[in-house]
Amino acid sequence: ESVARGTAPGELHCFPGAGPVRHTLNPMVTGTSVLGVKFDGGVIIAADMLGSYGSLARFRNISRIMKVNENTILGASGDYADYQYLKQVIDQMVIDEELVGDGHNYSPKAIHSWLTRVMYNRRSKMNPLWNTVVIGGFYNGESFLGYVDKLGVAYEAPTIATGFGAYLAQPLLREVTENKATLSKEEARQLVDRCMKVLYYRDARSYNRFEITTVTESGVEVEGPLSSETNWEIAHLISGFE
């Protein structure tokens, strides 16, 4: 009734309450490339440990790779807060699954499939999780490597690189994997080491401190922080890019 006649001077009127709706319009603290390579008997994922605030190298010791369970690992580039949220949700899912006590756990493929639904659902609400995620695992004798981005676009591939790595590292990864049917664990490790060095040289948002995580039949192995041997002797010869 008061809405129809308007509010009298000095009279209070309560409008229907609704909280503000906030959307991630642009990411704040971000991580750059994540690399993933399948090898004979497992998968290797690598990412540096830098959280950039715009172009400022703000947080230099943060992990962007998580162990989901004994057969699945996950690496994320993009918004670090959204990655932390995803990590929290996945960790709780894994705990809930273990509490059932039926001897089953999430396979890499299941986590990948679930992530495609979450990412697509959030993008459909115009409030995406601003990440590109790489899922690796070894389950039932098979290596798995999958990609999901903030729109829910997903695929599986023998090599994956996100962010700037899609331009700089992916050609190097494909050059090796397309000429060999399968890689050994040592070959995959050397390849990833080389790509991380190239990314440090060429990507201004990267950092020379990184983690390399391997998943095989025997479980998950996390190495790091690691760093590459670098040589800047020829840097003064490179000009014209200022």
UniProtKB/Swiss-Prot annotation:
List, in alphabetical order, the GO biological process terms annotated in this UniProt record.
Answer: proteolysis involved in protein catabolic process
Encoding gene per record = psmb4
Classify the main location: cytoplasm
Alphabetized SUPFAM superfamilies for the sequence: N-terminal nucleophile aminohydrolases (Ntn hydrolases)
Instruction: State if Nucleus is listed as a keyword.
Output: yes
Residues the record marks as active site:
T24 (nucleophile)
Domain of life from the UniProt record: Eukaryota
Write out the function statement from the record: Non-catalytic component of the proteasome, a multicatalytic proteinase complex which is characterized by its ability to cleave peptides with Arg, Phe, Tyr, Leu, and Glu adjacent to the leaving group at neutral or slightly basic pH. The proteasome has an ATP-dependent proteolytic activity.
For this entry, the protein name equals Proteasome subunit beta type-4
Q: Which Gene3D superfamilies match?
A: Glutamine Phosphoribosylpyrophosphate, subunit 1, domain 1 (3.60.20.10)
Any one cellular-component term (Gene Ontology): proteasome core complex
Keyword annotations from UniProtKB, A to Z: Cytoplasm, Nucleus, Proteasome
| Record lineage | Eukaryota, Metazoa, Chordata, Craniata, Vertebrata
Organism per entry = Xenopus laevis (African clawed frog)
Q: Which family would the database say this protein is a member of?
A: Belongs to the peptidase T1B family.
